[in-house]
From Swiss-Prot:
Family to which this protein belongs: Belongs to the TrpF family.
Recorded catalytic activity of this chain's protein: N-(5-phospho-beta-D-ribosyl)anthranilate = 1-(2-carboxyphenylamino)-1-deoxy-D-ribulose 5-phosphate
Source organism of the structure: Chlamydia trachomatis serovar L2 (strain ATCC VR-902B / DSM 19102 / 434/Bu)
Entry keywords, A to Z: Amino-acid biosynthesis, Aromatic amino acid biosynthesis, Isomerase, Tryptophan biosynthesis
GO MF, one annotated term: phosphoribosylanthranilate isomerase activity
Top EC class, one word: isomerase
Keyword Isomerase applies: yes
Protein's GO biological process: L-tryptophan biosynthetic process
UniProt protein name: N-(5'-phosphoribosyl)anthranilate isomerase
Pathway note: Amino-acid biosynthesis; L-tryptophan biosynthesis; L-tryptophan from chorismate: step 3/5
EC number: 5.3.1.24
Length: 208
């Protein structure tokens, strides 16, 4: 079970997430996000996890290929998360350079908002509650993932519902942001991260 801690805004949070066993550390570059980071801050975050095994992921919802290449080169980011328009063109231009995550937005009723574009299992599909930062899950019981082996469950996952999500859907990974944050601020809670990552790894082992 892979775990991605997304929306990291501080190097200390990234370092603690890596120590706790996070496989991926996500940084958001969407300017309309409260968790948006600058290139300078992203570079410090990447440096904070260099000694561990966590992989830095840049979240680029509407950026051009040229912008993505420039930001990743400046920061040291090695994986990217894509969404938005011209996705097949971006895949063709970027797949040789990066590991790629692709976001599929899901409505509250558990229905994906769009069909899955053609892609191979090297791309990790992330299912996220439409709206992105609502902090609540879509209807997992009504949800059925596309026929794509490599996928993560996101959108409202937290320590209190992770067991239900894994039991119902058996995803290959978990993507969490607000579910491990301190109340009222955009910083991650060390103990919540540790507990959620441990739960994800233990629960995935028990379902094998």
């Amino acid at each position: 079970m892979k775990v991605k801690i997304c929306g990291i805004t501080h190097p200390d949070d990234a370092r603690e997430a890596a120590k706790a066993g996070a496989d991926y550390i996500g940084m958001i570059f969407a300017k309309d996000s409260r968790r948006c980071v600058s290139e300078e801050k992203a570079k410090y975050i990447v440096e904070a996890i260099q000694e561990g095994n966590s992989e830095p992921v840049g979240v680029f919802p509407e950026h051009s290929v040229e912008e993505i290449l420039a930001i990743t080169e400046a920061t040291g980011i090695t994986s990217i998360q894509l969404s938005g328009e011209d996705i097949l063109f971006k895949f063709s231009q970027l797949r040789e350079h990066f590991s790629i995550f692709y976001v599929v937005s899901v409505y509250s009723n558990g229905q994906p908002s769009a069909a899955l574009p053609p892609m191979n299992d090297a791309v990790t599909v992330v299912y996220d509650h439409i709206g992105g930062e609502r902090g609540s899950p879509f209807d997992w019981k009504a949800f059925s993932p596309f026929q794509h082996n490599n996928w993560m469950l996101g959108g409202g996952v937290n320590l209190w519902n992770i067991k239900e999500g894994i039991s119902l859907l058996n995803p290959r990974g978990i993507d969490v942001s607000s579910g491990v944050e301190r109340p009222g601020i955009l910083r991650k809670d060390i103990f919540l991260m540790q507990a959620l990552i441990n739960s994800a790894k233990e629960l995935s082992s028990s379902t094998l």
